[in-house]
Amino acid sequence: MYYDGTGVEQSDEKAVEWYKKAAEQGDAAAQCNLGYMYKNGRGVEQSDEKAVKWVLKAADQGYADAQYHLGYMYSNGFGVEESDEKAVEWYLKAAEQGYVTAQLCLGTMYSQGTGVEESDEKAAEWFQKAAEQGDASAQCALGLMYKYGIGVEQSYEKAAKWVQKAAEQGDADAQYKLGVMYENGRGVEQSYEKAVEWYLKAAEQGLADAQCNLGAMYGNGTGVEQSYEKALEWFQKAAEQGFADAQCDLGYMYDNGTGVEQSYEKALEWYLKAAEQGLADAQYFLGEKYYNGIGVARSYEKAVAWFLKAAKQGFAYAQFRLGFMYDCGRGVEQSDAKAREWYQKAAEQGDELAIEALDWLNDK
């Protein structure tokens, strides 16, 4: 009552006083709560060590909440030497009593092989237990396991079922993933309108992936009335969070004056942000900017450098352009052999310009 001010004036100090009286008499719930007060420094001087002392007393009595929190303390090294193995041990005790957060943690640890031998099957088992109790994170994780057939037999329908349960609870990541499923018609009947609906829910929670996809839907008029202005708005939100795809898309809109006043300088700025994160599309676009001297001083050397970064990632246009640079000796020493090498890579991906260039080069 003193802890949350129910029926009395809230007081952490008095809550600690009464928790301690009960804890010293062996009450497990009070011991756990007293540990919580020490952990968070509420009504008492903060002490991870004393927190562990009291939580351990409760955990040893089989109190599931304490067992979970003790596992958490071992997992993070709070008041004890960090030990993933001991974390698993205590999570397991709580999970076997049906403690949902412990079940979720166990699923995660089995999926990553943290503190325990990796097992996708056991991960799925624990995610399933937590999911059936309504845990949104577990529902989303289980959905992804069904989507990719990890630890369970692949089923897009079951994937959609579990992801939808999490999405309906407001889980942003699940809302985004459900949007992707509706956009692609995986496990559900394809519906661009429903894809937009779910992307919007996740985007409004600030999820950059969803903001970027929503921007693309508005830009293409897919499932929603086309609006370059709204596309720009959502790309901007995601780009400002550092989402590389959105940064590139935003750069492209500035580059072409789509939904915004054209600005090669701003296009270059956003392309660069995405390119520095390793996005091949942006690296290619930057290469073109340097090659043509648009928004920046022309530099064949810098063009080659950016084309090369994208080409090494398998970006066909960049491979062709790099072959062209070697073919013409622009920004690099002329080399038929290297031109042929890069033309070949692009041609193998079906790039028609590369195929023509390769034929011409072979006929020289």
Residue ranges and their predicted role:
Residues 2-6, 11, 24-27, 40-42, ...:
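Short helix-capping/linker turns of helical repeat alpha-solenoids
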Residues 16, 52-55, 88, 100, ...:
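Short hydrophobic transmembrane-like helices used for membrane targeting/insertion
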Residues 1-4, 33-40, 69-76, 105-112, ...:
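Hydrophobic face of amphipathic alpha-helices that form TPR/SEL1-like repeat modules
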Residues 345-364:
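Terminal, low-structured helical/coil segments at or just beyond the last alpha-helical repeat
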Residues 2-3, 19, 36, 63, ...:
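Aromatic (phenylalanine/tyrosine) cluster motif
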